Amino acid sequence: MNKINLKNFYLNLVIILVVFIFDRTTKLYILKLAEVETSVDIYITPFLNLFLIWNKGIAFGLFSIDGSVIYNSITILIGLIIIAIIFMMLKNDNIQRYFFALIAGGAFGNFYDRIVYTAVPDFIDLHFYGFHWFVFNVADIFITIGVFCLILVELFFNNKKTNEKN
């Protein structure tokens, strides 16, 4: 690795660690509250509550099942996806590598929970006039931001490069 690639590698590693640590800190705080309270349902604003649920599925509780074979298969698949994301991050030489680092940091946070707790603690409850969005966590926020930014880069910047070549 040359100096620039090594610097980028360390910067990506820092991004992943910061996201992971921030996610773990928020989850540990909520879990500490759950030890004291019988249930965690904290009113913050008219549109935001902290409400702890345990997600055994994947994003937004999809495929939430109790079968250990299916659960283990999904967990292994998620681990392989994380490896693929890190590979894409390392192979990228542009701004996209930082978005892959955001996704990897969030994915590591949720993967850690799946391994340690066999479920992911979700606790951010956004709602508006009775409509509740899926309950999620900080890792999900960083994954979403990373994916959204990758889509924007692909739509607006990579598309321009393709048009300029033609």
Curated annotation (Swiss-Prot):
The chain crosses the membrane at residues 11-31, 42-62, 69-89, 99-119, 133-153. This is Lipoprotein signal peptidase. It catalyses: Release of signal peptides from bacterial membrane prolipoproteins. Hydrolyzes -Xaa-Yaa-Zaa-|-(S,diacylglyceryl)Cys-, in which Xaa is hydrophobic (preferably Leu), and Yaa (Ala or Ser) and Zaa (Gly or Ala) have small, neutral side chains. GO terms for cellular component: plasma membrane. The active site is at 122, 140. It comes from Pelagibacter ubique (strain HTCC1062). Pathway: Protein modification; lipoprotein biosynthesis (signal peptide cleavage). Belongs to the peptidase A8 family. Keywords: Aspartyl protease, Cell inner membrane, Cell membrane, Hydrolase, Membrane, Protease, Transmembrane, Transmembrane helix. Its EC number is 3.4.23.36. It is an enzyme of class 3 (hydrolase). GO terms for biological process: proteolysis. It is a multi-pass membrane protein.
